[in-house]
Amino acid sequence: FQTGGWENTKKGVYQIKDTFINFWFKFVFPHMSDLYLLKPHEFYDRYIAPELGTYLKRYFRNVCMEYMMLLNQMGRMPFPVHKIGTWVGKTGNIDIIAQSTDRRNIVGLCNWDQPQLTSQMCEELYQNMEKAKIRSEHIFLFSATRFEPMLAEHAKTDDRFELIDMNEL
C-alpha cells in the first residue's frame, strides 16, 4: 500500500498460503512420533486444542477481508475498493486496509480472541494508523465475541463506524 509510513513498516511477512499445509506444519509434523502413539482425541487435546484459538485468529482476519470484498462486489462499501490487505508495522499492525484508486482508505480491526472489542483497541488502531500515515473516514470493526457497550452506543450515532459480529459474517 502507498501509505507513506515506511520507517515504521516491517520489511516483509512470509506465510504459508495453503491452509491445509499450514495446519500440517503447525500441528502435525512437529509431533509425528506422538501421532502414531496417541489416540486421535489425545493428540488433539495435547497438541491442537491449546493453540487452535491463536491459530484461527489469522484466518478470522481473512474471513473479514472476504466479507469486505463481497460488500465491494455488491456495491455496498462507502466507495469502490481497488485493493485490500494488511499493514504490518514494527510495533503494531492494521488488520485490514481497503484502498480506492484515488487512495481513500477504509480500515478494519478484527477481534477474535478477546472477550469484547473495546474502545482501547480502537485507540491502538488509531495509533497504528498514525504510524502507517493512513487516514480513513470509515472503520469496520469485526468481533467474533461482542462489542464494548459504550463502543456500540457510539457507533449508532457515528456513521464512520461499521460494527460486524459473527452473525453477520
Which sequence ranges carry the predicted segments?
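Accessory nucleic acid-recognition modules appended to NTPase machines
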Residues: F1-T91
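Conserved nucleotide-binding/hydrolysis micro-motifs of P-loop NTPases
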Residues: T3-G5, D113-Q114, R146-E148
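Short conserved micro-motifs at the rims of enzyme active sites and ligand-binding pockets
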Residues: K26-V28, L109, L151-H154
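Conserved catalytic cores of phosphodiester-cleaving nucleases, focusing on short active-site segments
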Residues: M68, I94-T118, L125-Q127, I139
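Short helix-loop-beta junction
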Residues: M69-M77, D102-N105, K131-A132
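Long, low-complexity, charge-rich intrinsically disordered regions
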Residues: N111, K131-A132, A144
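Short, charged, amphipathic alpha-helix that recurs within catalytic cores of restriction-modification
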Residues: T118-I139, M150-H154
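Domain-level recognition of nuclease-like catalytic cores that cleave nucleotide substrates
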Residues: F140-L169
